[in-house]
């Protein structure tokens, strides 16, 4: 399917076959200064049926996996660490987002048929999931940096501080996502079905730039720099001091951070490229807009996939998580105590900070 841009009276634009963009902004009208010469813009996206199958699998895995993670952490009161509290909140964010996946999937297949209120709510949950995820991981990186590099008992060891920090992260995530919540609505573009989109009137381009740059700066780039700084020095300390026991205890945390970056970094890099194109920092052409639009579609699916991956990390890398899950199953008679004994009791590794070991 294509969109034909024509030089009509008053530079109006005829949009034919405008498809549901699903919140990633590709295929929107070009900026006001664009040269409106005839231009054929492809809106062909990934196979809808394949996307529906992937979303359905992600939904089921995320629903089951994150529920089990929350169960294991909440059940393991003894030995629960500050990091576990952060990971518990991370699982909550992924679970909340997973609950919206069926709605997003249906909108890909049939357009947005759920009205403006639900459009605002699911868009808010999607943004809050991303921002809370990277902010929680940034807090974990700072806690590990202080505990290992400086060998200090951090303020976050005081449980009331941990609660306030987590509440602050959720509040900041909502604030960063608030513009999307305010301006998203069920919108009817010309020659298209309803979409869940932000319609900002004549100043759409300018406001969309602001809505992108500020959250990307404070909700992605700055936390990413904090994580790179903290984990860079943490890794250097672990390897230079040959602290193998702490290195093993950090494997799960490093894996969680790595998977988050692999899933969400591509989408945000493409989004930055799209923003630069709309700001005329890089030239806007039909081909470039097509390429960025397809890249946004593909990388967004990768970002959605992240919501079901953390539980898999805990299962394959986190020995304590596996043992905690088997222990719960044994208590409820789902497996024998002999089978639990064969799994063995993982040793909890201590540290100078007192909280390097985690339930996972």
Swiss-Prot record:
GO terms for biological process: calcium-mediated signaling; immune response; neutrophil chemotaxis; positive regulation of cytosolic calcium ion concentration. The keyword Cell membrane applies. Its main location: membrane. The chain crosses the membrane at residues 49-75, 85-105, 121-142, 164-183, 209-231, 252-273, 295-315. Residues 1-48, 106-120, 184-208, 274-294 are extracellular. It is a multi-pass membrane protein. This is C-X-C chemokine receptor type 2. It comes from Bos taurus.
């Amino acid at each position: 399917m294509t969109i034909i841009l024509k030089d009509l009276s008053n530079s109006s634009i005829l949009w034919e076959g405008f498809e549901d963009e699903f919140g990633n902004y590709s295929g929107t009208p070009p900026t006001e200064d664009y040269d409106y010469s005839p231009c054929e813009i492809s809106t062909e996206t990934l196979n809808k049926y394949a996307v529906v199958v992937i979303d359905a699998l992600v939904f089921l895995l995320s629903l089951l996996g994150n529920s089990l993670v929350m169960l294991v952490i909440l059940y393991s009161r003894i030995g629960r660490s500050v990091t576990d509290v952060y990971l518990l909140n991370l699982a909550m964010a992924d679970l909340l987002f997973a609950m919206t996946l069926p709605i997003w999937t249906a909108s890909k297949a049939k357009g947005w048929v759920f009205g403006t209120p639900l459009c605002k709510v699911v868009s808010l949950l999607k943004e809050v999931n991303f921002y809370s995820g990277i902010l929680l991981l940034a807090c974990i990186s700072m806690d590990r940096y202080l505990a290992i590099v400086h060998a200090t008992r951090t303020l976050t060891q005081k449980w009331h501080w941990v609660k306030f920090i987590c509440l602050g992260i959720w509040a900041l995530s909502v604030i960063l996502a608030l513009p999307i919540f305010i301006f998203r609505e069920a919108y009817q573009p010309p020659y298209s079905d309803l979409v869940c989109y932000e319609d900002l009137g004549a100043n759409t381009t300018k406001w969309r730039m602001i809505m992108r740059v500020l959250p990307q700066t404070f909700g992605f780039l700055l936390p990413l720099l904090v994580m790179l700084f903290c984990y860079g020095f943490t890794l250097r300390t672990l390897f230079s001091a040959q602290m193998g026991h702490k290195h093993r205890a950090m494997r799960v945390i490093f894996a969680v951070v790595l998977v988050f970056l692999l899933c969400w970094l591509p989408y945000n890099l493409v989004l930055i490229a799209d923003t630069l194109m709309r700001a005329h920092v890089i030239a806007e052409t039909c081909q470039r807009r097509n390429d960025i639009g397809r890249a946004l579609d593909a990388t967004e699916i990768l970002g959605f996939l992240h919501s079901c991956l953390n539980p898999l990390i805990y299962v394959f890398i986190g020995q304590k998580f596996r043992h905690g899950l088997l222990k719960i199953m044994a208590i409820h008679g789902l497996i024998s105590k002999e089978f639990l004994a064969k799994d063995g009791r993982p040793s909890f590794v201590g540290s100078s900070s007192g909280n390097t070991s985690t339930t996972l």
